[in-house]
Amino acid sequence: GDGVADINIYELVKFHKSHKKAITVTSSQPDGRFGALEISQDNQVLNFKEKPKGDGSWINAGFFVCEPKVFDYIGDGDDVVFEQEPLMNLASDGEIFTYKHHGFWMPMDTLRDKNKLNQLWIDKQAKWRIWDK
């Protein structure tokens, strides 16, 4: 799957250059997929939040700015998964910063995601369509 966002690429690259590391990963805090219950110790429902903003975690939004030395972390072969060993080793070596994106971001991993994004486009609510502004 892929993600769709209204990331300011110029600001992302500027951020990357200012930190002088091998890679900058864009992060986002996606909305939760389900309603959340706040429950007391005796199981009484105290509050209900419809699809709250995630759990506060920042996730990999899938947009990267890389320096050539990133290739030194990628092994040979077709079985390399970039988000696993290469990124973990870059993080261990202190070579990753994150650009925290506070704007629109949505994955397109499922048919449900695709349909929602298509509907946003049809309704002219596609926040990633920045070239018409």
Labelled PLM ranges:
Residues V4, Y10-K17, P30-D31, Q44-K133:
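Catalytic-core segments of class I nucleotidyltransferases/pyrophosphorylases
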Residues H19-Q29:
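A short, conserved acidic/glycine-rich loop-to-beta-strand motif
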Residues S40:
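Short, acidic, Ser/Thr-enriched surface-loop or helix-capping motifs
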